[in-house]
């Protein structure tokens, strides 16, 4: 037990902390605020406090808890909403009303709720860390697998029968090799700064299907991959994150609102329970864990919220699920690091950020991956991390963006100009890239269409050609272009407006399945091939631009039936044949 000697914002310095450990959780002051030791010098400890420190004075006590910042992992995580240190916000509201009183704590998992447990092991079985003891139907979508904690191995000497239990009841007893008995409950605790172990990492070969055409077709992300969405204010970062949280084919979604506006978390809370999962027809909230750490909450908790979120994601990965983690926004976390670092009087790096910013960001993204989990029966699970970055003024040369780009493999650059033109998602196809294309193309070729990569590359080349032509058009006007190049501009406009643009608020267009994406691409590229043929045969470009099929191609994104979209290929061919007859070519 120590005494406070100095308070500067979220940082508290305490004396007399002999025996305290680095990253140990402490209770600060008379109110018992939650804090974490981030520096030790002799018996003096520097503590970052996860709550508002107003009113705390020197001389008040600091009490160590003996444990590091940990999360509870077990049934009850899904559909919950936590703050950055895994306090359940609903529970805190019951205790203190709409505003959180300081020093309040509540167990992260409900202690009184009974879960129906079905054992999958029997007495005498040998178990190791990561084995499944039994299953609990946590929601109608997700079956929660009760895992043996990674540090336990031995022989089952007692296992609970099928029935209803709370998370505090002992459901199994394991005799360890040294003869001691370990009692296992439905949940266990895990320190957030330590990554959960696994057997080995697998290459990311399966794409995370998001239903967003720009992302799936042009800049794919693999399951277990990492992506960054940088963009200036109002360019659609949060809406893109919401779209991915709603429609990506991950089985569990962890959404971290880290230092963003409170009304954005409210949007998620209001929308998700109403939205149905396209695969199961059940509310999306049933597969979601929300971590709300809005911009008016204490700065230090932002760092904790990032680690809390990724630890929960790794836990579901260990059960064999594909998890998508959205962090919105990692810039706010970096700003919190900068503020704490400044108060610690550390040497500032670029733009005032601490020198260790790069390693902190890398450490976070490195916890993503597709892995073979621990346990006697190997399972495959993945954590895909998608982090939004909000550089001030949309400047991509800023340290947070640059350090993020070093470690992520997919870059979706949001563009304020596209957003102003009402082109959403405002992902700039000339600046963005994905390094997973070669890895995921086999999956696309096997499961969707063997010509996927060829079509994608053709479309990309056309869009790049358009950017070159636009320069010329700006100088000399469109009439100076040869017919072939005028025709390219017609097709690329179709690609931009009828393919890349996607309406997040339209019932059909908000989610576009892979088969439909490929069929739409085929329709547009078929139009391109016929257009080039027509121009070479001498058909005027104006005639091609007036073809009635163009309007139908423009509307195909709102058509749920893939066969009707495919029929547009024959219709296009028929209209071109008529043109050829008309001009006798």
Curated annotation (Swiss-Prot):
The keyword rRNA processing does not apply. It is a peripheral membrane protein. It is an enzyme of class 7 (translocase). It comes from the Archaea. It is found in: Cell membrane. Pfam families: ATP-synt_ab, ATP-synt_ab_N, ATP-synt_ab_Xtn, ATP-synt_VA_C. This is A-type ATP synthase subunit A. The lineage of its organism: Archaea, Methanobacteriati, Methanobacteriota, Thermococci, Thermococcales.
